[in-house]
Amino acid sequence: MGKMRVRFPTLVLVLGIVFLMAVSIGIAYGEKDVLKSHERPEEREQEEWQPRRQRPQSRREEREQEQEQGSPSYPRRQSGYERRQYHERSEQREEREQEQQQGSPSYSRRQRNPYHFNSQRFQTLYKNRNGKIRVLERFDQRTNRLENLQNYRIVEFQSKPNTLILPKHSDADYVLVVLNGRATITIVNPDRRQAYNLEYGDALRIPAGSTSYILNPDDNQKLRVVKLAIPINNPGYFYDFYPSSTKDQQSYFSGFSRNTLEATFNTRYEEIQRILLGNEDEQEYEEQRRGQEQSHQDEGVIVRVSREQIQELTKYAQSSSGKDKPSQSGPFNLRSNEPIYSNKYGNFYEITPDRNPQVQDLDISLTFTEINEGALLLPHYNSKAIFIVVVGEGNGKYELVGIRDQQRQQDEQEEEPEEVRRYSARLSEGDIFVIPAGYPISVNASSNLRLLGFGINAYENQRNFLAGSEDNVIRQLDREVKELTFPGSAEDIERLIKNQQQSYFANALPQQQQQSEKEGRRGRRGPISSI
């Protein structure tokens, strides 16, 4: 017991010393941290933020980054709702980008959709108070993917009532279609002259080198004509040759020498100049003598005509052949025969090279599509024809599906995987879009939409629909192949295909949305429920 009493104070003393040392060490470290925080705040802040910049990305950030980079692929595990949200965000982003690009001055050089040409892409050739003539830019000028359309151009002219486009000939074959109003077209050859009356939907071929002039005989309606031009001499370029001289162009007679003209007409040059080429002094004297306010030369290539002149020009004109067999030279109407596709949502008319001798050697087909408001032309593709489509009337939107060119990727040393791309654009009157062969397309009409199509390389072209109850190539696949091709079972695939009971044209609204709208209308009409 005595020994225990002696050791206990010693033990207490040792424990006290250890406690004091621990407290001293703690205070020293605390002061060091305080000094560090006050002396080096920047380094401390960097240490705090550095791990955050290097932290792994969340799935949401990965999806957003893929959307910014334009990647079409999804994360491996996504619900149906996430996929729908992904598509909706992508579509909204693409539409915003297209709208912003269309307002940019460098839009033509960096446009994301090289297959769409709005009405501003036309170049005006002639314009006066009576009308205008304009031509669309070359298709291969936008992208080399359309280089096979290098030798095809679109020309449009519009003229007011009671006007005439002066005679001319061109080094190009023309296939023209009337999209508004009425026209009387006269084609002149060395041995005869033939006049034709054309109405809405009528088409006519004007061979290269044929002199022609176009009259708008109507008293009220404007005339609108669209022509497909196929140049003869230089691919992609054609020229109009006028025998008359106006403020817009010179007569081709003015290109000959004085001696040649005198020998040609067996007349003095001064007389030739006064009658054919025009002389400013002589012209002014004639105007004063006749009391005219303005001569035809001052008006340009589109001039006014009197009612008496219109009666003479239309006296012997022939009309289109209607449902009769198309003639070798006369006009034909695109809607004269029964549509090849038709239901309550729209009609599709087509004239193929084997059915019309005028376009047979050109290997061109013509189509006319009527899509009613709120309807959809179901997805389909053409086997070999390239279609140039002109919006004649209405508004809508189209979606075209293509594949990124893998060969061009190799040329540009890109290592991106092959991917599907969607090219879409809103459509309005005067717009033009191209449908390459093999590219699936669908068209949605927000108002009654009328489309004129020129099919290039059209002989034996086949139109393959990807949905609908008829002419559906997906439906024709073997049952076993369907199971191997798609993730769903054969029963699910068959049920999905049969859900669309319409063919060629259908309602643009999904079935669920149609049902909800019907219920909404029924609810608005019904009585108010009691609480």
From Swiss-Prot:
The keyword Glycoprotein applies. Residues 115-273, 332-494 form the Cupin type-1 domain. GO terms for molecular function: nutrient reservoir activity. Residues 316-337 have a biased composition (Polar residues). The keyword Glycoprotein applies. PANTHER family: OS03G0336100 PROTEIN-RELATED (PTHR31189), VICILIN C72 (PTHR31189:SF41). This is Conglutin beta 1.
